[in-house]
Amino acid sequence: MKDLTSSDADALIADLGQKARAAAAVLAEASAERKHAALIGAADAILEAEDAILDANAEDMHYAEEKGLSPAMLDRLKLDPARIRAMAEGLRSVAAQADPVGKVLAEWDRPNGLNIRRVATPLGVIGVVYESRPNVTADAAALALKAGNAVILRGGSESLNSSAAIHRALVTGLKQAGLPETAIQMVPTRDREAVAAMLRAQDYIDVIVPRGGKGLVGLVQKEARVPVFAHLEGICHVYADRDADLDKARRVVLNAKTRRTGICGAAECLLIDWQFYTKHGPVLVQDLLDAGVEVRAEGELAKVPGTVPAEPSDFGQEFLDKIIAVKLVDGVEEAIAHIRRHGSGHTESILTENDATAERFFSGLDSAILMRNASTQFADGGEFGMGAEIGIATGKMHARGPVGAEQLTSFKYLVTGDGTIRP
């Protein structure tokens, strides 16, 4: 399917949306056991379909190489037996989580005789738009299903064959569990007009989740008429306080920057308290340099051999590479002010042994995730015990931080009286 007109795309998404709405009504009442069975069946089907998935991925790799995709994008696209096993394990992990649907979030009795319960319910239909990683097909579908939602998946054009092969395995799990095949649907075209149609499909899609780079997320946030769970950038900060433990600080700073530089939880800016620097010298900067990181330093830190003078634009920059901006600050208040000015609301970490300073850092910032003496690379749904995540949300409405199955629910009020009337 090529060169869709706007009306063609709207018709395609409307068809998928109507089927998804019908499936969502069934899923909303599906038992936890049935959803669990579907996820386990899908995990088994993915392993059984390994050869077919690898063949499909080889086609995608050839297509992507001809398109001239970067080595980093090709790596995200590539599947191998280990990555397929990890995908299946991810489905099993989500299956093992507690079912969020029907959970009583709060309950109280009123003097007027009413009993009121607030109970978790599915959102309905979720649209997921993502780029080259075919594993998102499995992760997003699993989390949506666990929370009783139908999902419409639109993967990257370069991963169409891989995603379709994974989707077939997911449908196998649905069928085995007696759930509607249309609970998990894929947009069957590479045409970008289909993405635009999803973003304006308020009648069929309850929330859009983009997974990808700044360009994709920015487009979705700008164009969507449907609510969006997303973060535009992961400009994560680490602040080494004057009361930081040196050994802990060295471990955390190095891990936060270098474990995986291309993820949204990678540290992009290191703030060092003047008193820490006076006591310990440029040890944190030197560790980064020794690890092959390009250190863009401001002021006194720029005198450290091997550093590069920082430009103002380096603070507030998401590098997604072995590059970090560093700066000296005079205490936690200056660190907070810097992060408020340059941060993206994703994840910040303070390194300190001082409880009061840590609490001030936590209260003074409103990022989705705030940490103490821990690497920002832990900003991940799996590490939070969610089984997996569909993304990280930095908005202030509904979901914040890692978006797992629980965050893909809403709630309703169940009110019980006894012939109760209002005077």
UniProtKB/Swiss-Prot annotation:
The keyword Oxidoreductase belongs to this UniProt entry's keyword annotation:
yes
User: Tell me, which GO biological process terms does this entry list?
Assistant: L-proline biosynthetic process
Q: Which reaction does it catalyse?
A: L-glutamate 5-semialdehyde + phosphate + NADP(+) = L-glutamyl 5-phosphate + NADPH + H(+)
Keyword Lyase assigned to the entry: answer is no
Using the UniProt record, give the first listed, main subcellular location. cytoplasm
Q: What is its EC number?
A: 1.2.1.41
The pathway it acts in is: Amino-acid biosynthesis; L-proline biosynthesis; L-glutamate 5-semialdehyde from L-glutamate: step 2/2
Annotated Pfam families: Aldedh
GO MF = glutamate-5-semialdehyde dehydrogenase activity; NADP binding
Q: Which InterPro entries match?
A: Ald_DH/histidinol_DH (IPR016161), Ald_DH_C (IPR016163), Ald_DH_N (IPR016162), Aldehyde_DH_dom (IPR015590), G-glutamylP_reductase_CS (IPR020593), Glu-5-SA_DH (IPR012134), GPR_dom (IPR000965)
**Leader sequence segment:** none
Q: Which cell locations does it reside in?
A: Cytoplasm
Q: Which top EC class is named for this enzyme in its record?
A: oxidoreductase
Function in brief: Catalyzes the NADPH-dependent reduction of L-glutamate 5-phosphate into L-glutamate 5-semialdehyde and phosphate. The product spontaneously undergoes cyclization to form 1-pyrroline-5-carboxylate.
What is the similarity comment for this entry? Belongs to the gamma-glutamyl phosphate reductase family.
Per its record, how is this protein called by name? Gamma-glutamyl phosphate reductase
